[in-house]
Amino acid sequence: MGKLALAAKITHVPSMYLSELPGKNHGCRQGAIDGHKEISKRCREMGVDTIIVFDTHWLVNSAYHINCADHFEGVYTSNELPHFIRDMTYNYEGNPELGQLIADEALKLGVRAKAHNIPSLKLEYGSVVPMRYMNEDKRFKVVSISAFCTVHDFADSRKLGERIVKAIEQYDGTVAVLASGSLSHRFIDDQRAEEGMNSYTREFDRQMDERVVKLWREGQFKEFCNMLPEYADYCYGEGNMHDTVMLLGMLGWDKYDGKVWSLSPSYSQASWHRSG
């Protein structure tokens, strides 16, 4: 019987890559990078063999899609922010078995999920960025699930999360799951882009994000789940926050009562532990 060892809501802010490079932004996202490396450390300590990523940069207009190729390899340049991420190489093993189990389980609840083992279907940066800092040595297999869902209902995303747990139970291994996406996600007007590098676009969003992280730390998931649809709407949650809905679906929704660790306060990077 498989085990879900760790679940986390993480950032994939592209300036993490800039933070590595010489220049004025060197070191600007070290806290976020350190948070990713701490999650990797905990996964290793728990014996995780596969990481599932809910990727809010994988936009889909029909169905839920699971990228579970045998192998992922490529050179990634962001088509929306090529001045942030350019020529980033990646090379990871996939897990077709687990991906297919997820699709099969989701279909049992009428969720239109499709597993793909297609060499030309590449990873998006919601997966590539965290794997850069968590999986440099290819310790973990990778499965990426679309989470920028344009015409999808929260109820289906929640069901998908529930069925992922069932799939993991059938899998002979230990799995971690990452909801890769921002909380509030309103981009600043282009002429003000430089001033927004290290600040929120709106004070309202900052206040809301801080409140949300406080709710998580205090275990107030009933309150958070009740506000989630409006929060995702009013604060422009990344991918409409389907990644977070999937994550909470896995963990029992508003009944989750496990531990929560906050690893990177600036980016609300939280690790939610569930043993089983």
Curated annotation (Swiss-Prot):
One of its GO terms (molecular function) is 3,4-dihydroxyphenylacetate 2,3-dioxygenase activity. The keyword Iron applies. Its EC number is 1.13.11.15. Transmembrane segments: none annotated. CDD domains: HPCD (cd07370). It catalyses: 3,4-dihydroxyphenylacetate + O2 = 2-hydroxy-5-carboxymethylmuconate semialdehyde + H(+). The keyword Transmembrane does not apply. It is an enzyme of class 1 (oxidoreductase). Pathway: Aromatic compound metabolism; 4-hydroxyphenylacetate degradation; pyruvate and succinate semialdehyde from 4-hydroxyphenylacetate: step 2/7. Its cofactor is Fe cation. Coiled coil: none annotated. Pfam families: LigB (PF02900). InterPro entries: HPCD, Xdiol_dOase_suB. One of its GO terms (biological process) is catabolic process. Keywords: Aromatic hydrocarbons catabolism, Dioxygenase, Iron, Oxidoreductase. Transforms homoprotocatechuic acid (HPC) into 5-carboxymethyl-2-hydroxy-muconic semialdehyde (CHMS). This is 3,4-dihydroxyphenylacetate 2,3-dioxygenase. It comes from Escherichia coli.
